[in-house]
Amino acid sequence: MFPHVMCADVYRVDPADPRAPPQDVWERLTPEERARVIDSLPSEWPVSESQPPEGDAHFEAKVRAREVLGGFFSRIGCKLYLGSELPVYYPGEAMFAPDVIAVMDVEPHARMRGMVSAEGRGLDLALEIHVAGDRRKDLERNVERFARLGIREYFLFDRGRLKLSGWRLMGEGRRVYQPIIPQQGFYFSEVLGLELQLEGERLRFYLGRAPLPESDELITTLERMVGEAEAHRTEESQMRVELEQQLAHEQHLREEAERKLAEALDELKRLRSRAR
């Protein structure tokens, strides 16, 4: 079977080996033909890319990483796309789907697939989380492939061995990774402007050595803030009640003093009248 068919500049995707067209072919396609090509690229894992399930540890690690990064960049107003296991198509390349990807300075809308020729740019960062299966894919083949494709940074969190590794393209136009050397256990990402480090069994992200809060930590913090606010409101309410009681008591004392003064004046007036 021929992997792809091109006839009269029309490119048809082979379902058994789905690939985006080479860049020169893409540039010859009309807008309508390009749209058909994009729609024909699978948004699910083809059999050739299938990987065995890696369980809760794998799922939780990738979801946590995406949520933490998404929350941080949303708060600072930075425009980027973060995806998880999104099928990515480089020109003429077999599809791949890293656990987490980052593409800077693009619209963050939801995507069914990432087609580099259509987007006009490729990935800036890829993160893989290895728990089970073929370690060589993450540790060796991805290092060569991601560098060749021009992905600026690649991080690998080996969850089973509790080891973090990172690679970066060094120099303009170079397509060979150099290892990122950790500083006191922190791996700096130029793409994200953040540091990565393992904390126990978790991959954490840091800004200025301060960890970015995770969802459970944010919930705990918000619950504490709500509790403190409610306690403060209760305290203020109690103080207001006590103040109202004090004002009422003072008002009663004033009224009592005025009554006694009036009685004294009346008595004085009566005594003066009798003295005459």
Stretches with model-predicted labels:
Residues 55-84, 89-96:
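Acidic-basic catalytic patches of nuclease active cores, encompassing PD-(D/E)XK
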Residues 152:
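Short acidic/polar active-site loop segments enriched in Thr and Asp
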Residues 82-83, 155-158:
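A structural signal for short, well-ordered beta-strand segments and their strand-loop junctions
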Residues 2-53, 71, 88-98, 103-125, ...:
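C-terminal interaction segment
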